[in-house]
Amino acid sequence: MNTWVKWYEEVMGFVNFLSFDDKQIHTEYSALMSKVMSNGNGRIKFPLNEPAKGKKKSQIEEYLDFYESPGVQHIAIATDDIIQTVRKLRSRGVEFLSAPPKEYYTAIPTRLGEHMKIMNENIDELEELAILVDADEEGYLLQIFTKPVEDLS
């Protein structure tokens, strides 16, 4: 990982924006280390990750075993209107993971609590599009994940 951090710094002019070690990112069974790289204006950020020793294979090790090489697992983009963006991407052939069970969407008001007052999106529409909702003390987050984009066949 440090080789790639150095490459992005020296060749691309990126900076190491944040770093996390295996004490900060871990479960009972696996852990990882991550260095988040950022371009000069901060509009592009991405993590460089590597597995840390754990009781089981990490998600990174499973990815490497399956694809037999490093690569891009997923890409995050920002949008001011996730509903329109997802509709446009779907119309252009992008496939997303399936929606969680109905109970996930039924529980959103309870999970979001006070954030429901500022949420403008319709829960039925979020469910229809399989958009996920998370919240913390700073606000709420809408997100969706594509199916794997790599094809090794």
Segments (PLM) and residue ranges:
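Glyoxalase I/VOC metalloenzyme domain signal
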Residues: 1-17, 26-153
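Eukaryotic intrinsically disordered and solvent-exposed regulatory patches
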Residues: 22-24
